[in-house]
């Protein structure tokens, strides 16, 4: 019922028909109350249904993050926005959930170890996705980034020296954990701040032991305290 509908009692009928048989007319009485809901963007319920953009690309056999991919995602994601969706699901690393879904969940941020041994990060797909969800779909409340504690406790990166993908082992409460995440969080914080997204960015932690969560939070508070 559109917000412009006047309160009152409306009467009509619904005609049900099929390929065989006679149409059936059903009387309908509808009472419209004087209250109306605000636009979904202003609803207070924090709706956070996770999105999997890669699944849309796979189903339609299009190049991920291409114009065709975004065109196919728009009506799907718009339904979420119309339901009051507040959060954008983002992947910091490759397979944060260790391949528990049918479709591969790739990173939106590429980790690359340069020939000089320094790690750098490519945010191109992350920026495309967040900008699309905010500006074209209308989901603007929160950027949920998964995760600092993946289920397989590994981070995939591209080693420029060999041209091959390799993995970093994550050990919360070990100095190596901070050595891995500290530089990333420093760079990532700087990046989202430059985009105007700092106050909306959150680090998602999913079904992880308390000791791991506390270790991750200690590192997070040290390098990017604005992140929720």
Name each model feature, range by range.
Residues 10-18, 24-227:
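Aromatic-lined carbohydrate-binding surfaces of glycoside hydrolases
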Residues 2-7:
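Short, surface-exposed loop/turn segments at beta-strand-coil junctions that are enriched for proline
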